[in-house]
């Protein structure tokens, strides 16, 4: 099994600051590497707080890399996976609405409520209502 961790950190070792705005630490060269890594993965895992704060789409942003995935018999983008204890995620987040790949939410909350409804509503867009507790 191969696991890749991709993180941008500041020179003093921080991932983020305390402001409500997204802290951009990556350069265009960094983003090219991010898309190369995404294209090589089966799945991308992000925490729920990343979805809430950054609203990432988690797509492979390079058309050549997307085509290479398709040529290998894969979907254009890796499966999206998140972890949430609270289920406080908007069904309108890019995680759920952007891309046709499967979306998986692992949670320990007993009632995913609107999150499950949002996922079910988007089943035709590739969103799975698979939840793990």
Task: Identify the function of each model-found stretch.
Residues 2-133:
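Active-site ligand-binding patch in enzyme domains
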């Amino acid at each position: 099994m191969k696991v890749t961790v991709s993180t941008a950190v500041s020179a003093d070792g921080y991932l983020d600051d305390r402001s409500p705005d997204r802290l951009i630490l990556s350069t265009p060269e960094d983003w090219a590497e991010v898309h190369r890594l995404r294209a090589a993965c089966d799945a991308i895992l992000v925490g729920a707080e990343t979805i809430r704060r950054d609203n990432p789409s988690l797509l492979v942003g390079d058309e050549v890399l997307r085509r290479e995935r398709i040529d290998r018999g894969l979907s254009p983008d890796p499966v999206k996976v998140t972890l949430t204890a609270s289920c406080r995620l908007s069904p309108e987040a890019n995680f759920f609405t952007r891309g046709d790949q499967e979306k998986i939410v692992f949670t320990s909350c007993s009632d995913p409520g609107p999150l499950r409804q949002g996922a079910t509503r988007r089943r035709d867009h590739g969103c799975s209502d698979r939840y793990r507790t």
